[in-house]
């Protein structure tokens, strides 16, 4: 049964953790983020669960499936561009955009089958936890409680924290697409939201303890902290750190591709452990390369903000349509 329906929770969680690791800047102060955690978690859990409930009633509509597929495709291109921008800052002129596309997309050939995504995600998640432990050990001597900023909890700080936490990533919506009822349970969404927000708040706390008042000014703060730590492993083996992040992005791209194929195939996908056909991969590769070339000169922060707005609007539209359909069905059954 496991082979037919692999557990993709690890891949979903990796995709969410990646958003914090590759963030170009911190989003809020740790104390305000901790206070905003319950409200943000409640909003995201409610949105994801309501979307999953409404999606079951409207999933047959092809234009909705196509719209969600477009959202996943655009998100994939943004992930490639974000990693390319990171490489540009870390090692300028080291790789062009086409090379980065090939670096990230070619591993998706191996990750075409869902079982490969699940197994690879679990291995990479373990490696990420080890790397995180080494990072904390490396900068432990520079973590100072005095660096925590006494920021007053004004409306502006609250709004900044909520904007940084209430991001409706596609990973929160994808469990609604899985055929296995157990993987669509509320428990899955609650764990995803809880773990990802806790990781975000925890990383902001560590970075604030390390950088202090200069934390918002740091570019790619997680990488900057790793390079400034006491352990030389992050300097000498920087390529290994970048390779780990590249694998994270490739797993995320493979997950989005699998979800997109499920959307296009509708209910024809009988089992969850299906493989993306090789005949579709050239179209996918060319499409990603085209979008990346098209958007390479646009501000990524603006594109990610538009993606988040599109995700919230799409979830709201699905909820509205699902709610209307449920009301009509209830009225017709009572007549």
Describe the predicted segments one by one.
Residues 65-73, 124-140, 195-204, 285, ...:
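Small-residue-rich segments of transmembrane alpha-helices in multi-pass membrane proteins
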Residues 11-15, 23-53, 307-322, 329-335:
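Extracellular loop-to-transmembrane helix junctions
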């Amino acid at each position: 049964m496991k082979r037919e329906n692999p557990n993709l929770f690890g891949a979903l969680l990796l995709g969410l953790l990646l958003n914090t690791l590759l963030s170009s800047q911190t989003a809020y102060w740790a104390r305000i983020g901790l206070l905003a955690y319950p409200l943000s978690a409640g909003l995201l859990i409610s949105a994801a669960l309501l979307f999953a409930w409404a999606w079951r009633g409207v999933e047959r509509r092809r234009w909705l499936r196509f719209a969600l597929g477009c959202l996943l495709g655009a998100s994939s291109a943004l992930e490639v561009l974000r990693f390319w921008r990171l490489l540009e800052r870390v090692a300028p002129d080291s790789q062009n955009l086409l090379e980065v596309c090939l670096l990230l997309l070619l591993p998706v050939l191996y990750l075409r089958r869902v079982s490969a995504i699940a197994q690879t995600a679990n291995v990479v998640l373990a490696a990420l936890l080890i790397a995180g432990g080494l990072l904390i050990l490396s900068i432990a001597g520079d973590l100072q409680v005095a660096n925590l900023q006494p920021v007053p909890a004004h409306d502006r700080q609250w709004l900044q924290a909520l904007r940084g936490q209430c991001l409706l990533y596609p990973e929160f919506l994808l469990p609604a697409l899985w055929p296995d009822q157990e993987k669509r349970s509320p428990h899955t969404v609650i764990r995803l939201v809880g773990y990802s927000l806790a990781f975000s708040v925890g990383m902001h706390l560590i970075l604030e303890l390390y950088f202090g008042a200069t934390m918002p000014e740091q570019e790619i703060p997680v990488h900057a902290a790793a390079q400034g730590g006491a352990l030389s492993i992050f300097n000498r083996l920087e390529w290994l750190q970048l390779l780990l992040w590249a694998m994270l992005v490739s797993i995320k791209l493979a997950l989005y591709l699998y979800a997109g194929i499920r959307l296009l195939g509708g209910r024809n996908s009988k089992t969850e452990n299906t493989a993306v056909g090789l005949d579709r991969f050239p179209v996918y590769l060319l499409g990603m390369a085209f979008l990346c070339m098209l958007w390479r000169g646009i501000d990524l922060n603006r594109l990610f903000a538009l993606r988040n707005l599109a995700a919230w609007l799409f979830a709201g539209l699905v909820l509205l349509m699902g709610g209307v359909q449920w009301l009509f069905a209830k009225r017709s059954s009572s007549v």
